[in-house]
Structures are given as C-alpha cells and as structure tokens.
Regions:
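N-terminal small-domain helix-loop-helix segment of the aminotransferase-like
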Residues: 2-7, 11-103, 110, 286-289
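Conserved glycine-rich beta-strand-loop-beta hairpin in the small C-terminal domain of fold type I
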Residues: 284, 299-309, 320-332
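Structural signature of PLP-dependent enzymes
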Residues: 264-268, 287-310
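Active-site PLP attachment segment
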Residues: 226-263, 278
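Active-site phosphate-binding strand-loop segment of PLP-dependent enzymes
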Residues: 149-218
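Conserved PLP-anchoring active-site segment centered on the Schiff-base-forming lysine
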Residues: 114-136
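Helix C-cap/helix->beta junction micro-motif
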Residues: 33, 139, 199-200, 230
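Structural motif of enzymes handling amino- and sulfur-group chemistry
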Residues: 258, 275-291, 296-297
C-alpha cells in the first residue's frame, strides 16, 4: 500500500506492510467488464437454504435477535458446535473451548493476535489463501512460506517443515482441503505433521472451512482427531460460509485450548462485541438441522469438477492437478 507523502504521518506505518487482497482487486476489475462470467470470489453460487433463512427470520420477528449476546456466542450456538464436533470430528469438546466470531476470517485474526508476539514466525504452506500472511504481519509476526510442489500434489512434507523451522517458529497454518489447490492431506500425512508439531511445541492452526466439500470418494480427516496430543496443540477454525452457502452472513468459530479461546474472545469483545445475533440463530439451524442441502450442493460441485477438469486439461499449455475438495481449479 503506497501512502501519499502529505498523509504519511496520519496513518499507522504498519499499513505499508499490508498488500490488500489481490482477489478483491481482481474481482473489482472483472465486475467492470460487461457480460463477463465471474469466477473470482470463493463462495458458493447457491442461496442459503430456506430452513436456515427461516430460523433467522423467526429470531428477528420474535425479538430474540434484537440484543447483544455474550462475546463468544450464545450458549445455544456453542452447544450446536459441540454437537457438530461430536458428529463430524468424532471427539467431545466443551463450550469453554468454543468462541464464535463474525466470520472465520475474524477467528483467524483473533487467533494470530492472541498468540503471535513480535518476531514470532508462522509457517504457511503455499499456494495459500492470501490473508494468512497479512494477518500474521498485523500481529507483528513473520510469515514463513514453504512452497508445496505440483509434483507432490501441492502438499508439504515434514522434511520441508523441519527445514523451515527455527527457534522462533510458533505456528503452523494448515488448510485442508486447500484454497486454492483443493488438495487434501491424508490421515498418514497429517499424523506425521501433527507429531512433528507436538515434538517441537508448535501450535497448529487448522483451517477446516472446506471439510464438508470433498469429491469422488476422497475423505477429509481433521488433524485434531488423530490424537489427544495433537488435539491439544491445535486450534480448529471453521464456519458456516462454504458448506451452507452463507458467506454473506459472516459467522465462523474456533475450537481449542480454553486459554487461547478466552484470549481470542477478549480481542473480539473490544472489536466486534459479539457475532450478529440473527446470524447465530441461522447457524444453529445450519449445524443442527437437516443436512440434505449440503449434500445437494456438494454433488453439484462434484459434477462441475468432473465436467470442467477434463476440458481444462485439454487446453494447450495448461497443467491441472485434479482437486479433491473445496471448489477451485488451480491450473499451471
């Protein structure tokens, strides 16, 4: 970000280190072209399922949505996440291990602001989502990018992580299924990475936002489900945006060590106060209500993948690794 000379003393100088979102910039450019089909922002193109809409409307009409909630979220919202983890993650969590936020992106922000001290390093496998690095910089940390290769299906190895580790390494960011590659780490790969993190006392930031969107028989394994030791090192970030087509509603959550969760809630309390109340009631319905619409959308994404992948692979000069999850194609 370039700061004009006449205004430079009016801005926080750390802004100069932030790049902004190139995806948003590209989206603005694409929006200016008449008749273009935009495949820019990472969101489903389905409307939010009606039962979820109705839950929010009901909360608005009967007055429940009119007021603040606890900063970390309604007790009912936390219980919905507890039940969701028991069903989809296979282990039991307590409400004090949950904090709900205004989107998974804000959950990530409060995590980095809670654990990163000036000079701490966070390892980020690339290709990656653009916001991890800038959020770490905002916490005065140092993002350390480790390049995953196309030959290894865009997945990093323990050997690569160890080569990047220093005495300042504090966090490993792990996004599986991946944005933008769509690749999924196997349970064996995750166990090796998790044990490495435990051995070196490195926190794992597990961005699981695409965990329900997997295709063609592939399976998502949460790294936090593999052992108690790995679970203690892991903060899981998830939300309702991708699986339930709720990107505009803005609700994400974090699950993990109660002390880290409490610190994240403290930051949220001084910034957003609480996640939007009506959205929380919508999210409760999303997480605990019928899941058939999730499967309908997943099948639609799978059909699109299986249609476009072979066509794109035929384009001269394009090399594409077939995604296993999320909803992106990442051609070379």
């Amino acid at each position: 970000m370039e700061i004009k000379k006449s205004l430079e003393n009016k801005f926080n100088t750390s802004l100069a280190n932030l790049t902004g979102s190139p995806i948003r910039e590209f989206d603005r450019y694409a929006s200016s072209i008449e008749g273009i089909i935009k495949l820019t922002l990472g969101e489903p193109d389905f409307p939010t399922p009606k039962n979820i809409q109705d839950a929010a409307i009901s909360a608005i009409k009967d007055g429940r949505a009119s007021f603040y909630t606890v900063t970390s979220g309604l007790p009912e919202s936390k219980e919905a996440i507890v039940a969701y983890f028991a069903k989809y993650y296979g282990y039991t969590i307590k409400p004090n291990q949950v904090t709900i936020a205004t989107g998974a992106k804000f959950s990530l922000y409060t995590f980095f602001m809670s654990v990163i001290n000036p000079g701490d390093e966070a390892i980020i496998p690339t290709p990656c989502w653009v916001s991890y690095g800038d959020q770490i910089k905002m916490a005065e940390g140092i993002p350390v990018f480790v390049q995953a290769t196309e030959a290894n299906h865009f997945k990093v190895t323990v050997e690569q992580l160890e080569a990047a580790r220093t005495e300042k390494t504090k966090v490993l960011v792990l996004n599986s299924p991946s944005n933008p590659t769509g690749m999924i780490y196997t349970a064996k790969e995750l166990l090796a990475i998790g044990n490495w993190a435990v051995e070196h006392d490195i926190l794992i930031l597990a961005d699981d936002i695409y965990g329900r969107l997997v295709y063609n028989g592939n399976e998502f394994t949460p790294i936090s489900s593999l052992s108690e030791a790995i679970r203690k090192q892991t903060i899981v970030i998830n939300g309702v945006s991708k699986s339930y087509s709720m990107t505009g509603w803005r609700l994400g959550y974090a699950v993990g060590d109660p002390e880290i969760i409490a610190a994240m809630s403290k930051i949220a309390g001084q910034t957003t106060s609480n996640p939007t109340t009506a959205t929380q009631y919508a999210a409760i319905e999303a997480l605990t209500g019928p899941q058939d619409t999730v499967e309908i959308m997943r099948q639609a994404f799978e059909e699109r993948l299986n249609t476009i992948y072979p066509l794109l692979s035929e384009v001269p000069g394009f090399d594409v690794v077939k995604p296993q999850g999320a909803f992106y194609l990442f051609p070379n």
